[in-house]
């Protein structure tokens, strides 16, 4: 799984605030001057930065569905409405589905549930992220769907490798795929999307929260750290809360 980050700009006394406030996202690319060595140094450092692991799903109007593992999920705001963000490297079928439907479901995972890390690992790999269907004209795999698709073409042998058995997947009232045994699901509508270099940053409003079958109190978070899926545990002394 690649580690993904977006640029963050903060105000500075050396620049007028109104310039930063009205700086268009389309201009971000011109500020990319990182050398190859700098990119590698950044990548190595970020491997020591623990990131939350979620699975995001969406769908197209024709009934096709898409999903992937993401490590860029971030809660943005709580009030007046919960808002979250995540980013996806493009090109991506999942990003295309989100842009078409303007909806996404974020599945929170637990290290206490073994199949959650299995889901995340398999959906992070390109060959397992999709259920390939044969394109008879080009004789190649070209369709990327999660189980439950309305597509009726003949599947290739690679579809047998799909990590999500249909019993794991249900549909939301909007028709998006849900992983029924997730720790929790955030049903969201997209409110903003911005292309930042080779990623798209999505900002979404959380319309409803659905708790999974596992008790939250007995579940440990699932994070990605140093190229491995890891559990979380409190340090001693336990910090009850951290708020800026």
Curated annotation (Swiss-Prot):
Entry EC number(s): 1.5.1.36
Subcellular location: Mitochondrion
Any one of the GO CC terms: mitochondrion
Subcellular location, principal: mitochondrion
Segments of this protein annotated with the region Disordered: 131-158
GO molecular function terms attached to this record: flavin reductase (NADH) activity; FMN binding; riboflavin reductase (NADPH) activity
Catalytic activity: a reduced flavin + NAD(+) = an oxidized flavin + NADH + 2 H(+)
Gene3D superfamilies: Electron Transport, Fmn-binding Protein, Chain A
SMART domains for this protein: Flavin_Reduct
UniProt GO BP: ubiquinone biosynthetic process
Reported consequences of knocking out the gene: Strongly decreases cellular coenzyme Q levels. Increases cellular sulfide levels. Decreases coq4 protein level; addition of p-hydroxybenzoic acid restores protein level. Sensitive to hydrogen peroxide, copper(II) sulfate, and mildly sensitive to thermal stress. Decreases growth on minimal medium.
Keyword annotations: Mitochondrion, Oxidoreductase, Ubiquinone biosynthesis
Compositionally biased region (Polar residues): 132-158
Pfam families on file: Flavin_Reduct
UniProt function note: NADH-dependent flavin reductase that acts in the coenzyme Q biosynthetic pathway. Required for synthesis of the p-hydroxybenzoic acid (PHB) precursor to form a quinone backbone.
Protein name, per record: NAD reductase coq12
Gene that encodes it: coq12
